[in-house]
């Protein structure tokens, strides 16, 4: 073949003419027409090579390659453990309640695990203060709770928060007295703080709207009497401890009794009957206290019978 290698296959017409020329033994001199045909052939070859070069660019890594549908990574939900780590307290609590509602057979197992836990008194107080704050926040903005003359509209608006607070308070008190808690000092201190929280709650102008408060204070009075009974029976605590501790509780109880219109009079009298003096005085005071406790239990039973025969509210936490 005559001429240079141009990097492409020559046209069939050119090849045939070249072969025929060589066959005759004549030397073929490229003319202008042959050069023009080669130029056209070169352009056609470049057009054919261009799509192939694009494919090379596409599949060679320079251009982006569209992934096949089978190789796509699909999103998936979090595992159970990771999801529970992200859930807040309310979400976990609601989840547990829903599970126990749908599967009642697990309630006993959950309850057994819960009562086996040892919750600190400070944690209970923190929870009570949060619920007490919710009561204050539910007060209508146009009425002041300091006057203790909230109207019926305020009672309707505050009732859910009040019942939630009182229910929580009663549950925590029952969990922090003997035999659940054997430390009488801790029980008295916790009961003292709970009584103060109830006494300081805003009251309503209509007496019937204060029913839940009064009923709660009556129940607190029974708890006070119960703890005083434990103190009277434990002579070691009664004689060994500093009398100023008991007098401090008695002084605070007297203040609470004044703010509750005498609803705490009975435990106050029982406290005063305790004599933190000599052993003989303590023994005599214990006998008189036992007589007072018998009267207290009889009175409590009579009151409960009267309440059961009456028309008490169905949503009261103390019935």
UniProtKB/Swiss-Prot annotation:
One of the GO BP terms on file = protein transport
* Glycosyltransferase found in the keyword field: no
Q: Which Pfam families match?
A: Cut8
**Could you name the domain of life of the organism this protein comes from?**
Eukaryota
Give the UniProt keywords, A-Z.
Answer: Cytoplasm, Nucleus, Protein transport, Transport
Region of interest: Disordered: 33-76
Q: What does this protein do?
A: Involved in ubiquitin-mediated protein degradation. Regulatory factor in the ubiquitin/proteasome pathway that controls the turnover of proteasome substrates. Targets proteasomes to the nucleus and facilitates the degradation of nuclear proteins.
Q: What is this protein called?
A: Tethering factor for nuclear proteasome STS1
Q: What is the lineage of its organism?
A: Eukaryota, Fungi, Dikarya, Ascomycota, Saccharomycotina
Gene name of the encoded protein: STS1
């Amino acid at each position: 073949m005559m001429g240079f290698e141009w990097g492409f296959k020559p046209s069939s017409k050119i090849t045939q003419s070249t072969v025929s020329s060589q066959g005759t033994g004549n030397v073929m001199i490229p003319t202008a027409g042959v050069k023009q045909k080669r130029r056209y052939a070169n352009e056609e070859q470049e057009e054919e090579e261009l799509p192939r070069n694009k494919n090379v660019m596409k599949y060679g890594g320079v251009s982006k390659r569209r992934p096949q549908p089978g190789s796509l990574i699909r999103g998936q939900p979090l595992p159970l453990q990771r999801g529970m780590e992200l859930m807040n307290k309310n979400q976990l609590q609601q989840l547990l309640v829903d599970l126990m509602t749908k599967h009642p057979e697990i309630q006993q197992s959950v309850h057994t695990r819960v009562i086996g836990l040892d919750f600190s008194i400070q944690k209970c107080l923190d929870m009570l203060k949060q619920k007490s704050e919710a009561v204050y926040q539910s007060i209508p903005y146009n009425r002041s709770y300091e006057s203790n003359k909230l109207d019926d509209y305020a009672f309707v608006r505050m009732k859910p928060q009040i019942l939630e607070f009182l229910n929580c308070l009663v549950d925590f008190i029952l969990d922090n007295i003997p035999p659940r808690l054997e430390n009488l000092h801790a029980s008295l201190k916790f009961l003292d703080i709970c009584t103060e929280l109830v006494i300081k709650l805003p009251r309503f102008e209509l007496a019937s709207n204060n029913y839940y408060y009064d009923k709660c204070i009556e129940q607190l009075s029974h708890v006070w009497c119960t703890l005083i009974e434990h103190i009277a029976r434990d002579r070691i605590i009664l004689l060994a401890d500093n009398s100023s501790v008991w007098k401090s509780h008695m002084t605070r109880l007297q203040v609470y009794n004044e703010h509750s219109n005498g609803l705490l009079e009975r435990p106050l009298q029982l406290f005063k009957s305790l004599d933190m003096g000599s052993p003989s005085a303590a023994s005599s005071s214990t006998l008189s206290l036992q007589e007072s406790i018998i009267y207290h239990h009889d009175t409590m039973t009579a009151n409960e019978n009267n309440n059961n025969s009456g028309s008490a509210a169905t949503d009261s936490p103390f019935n």
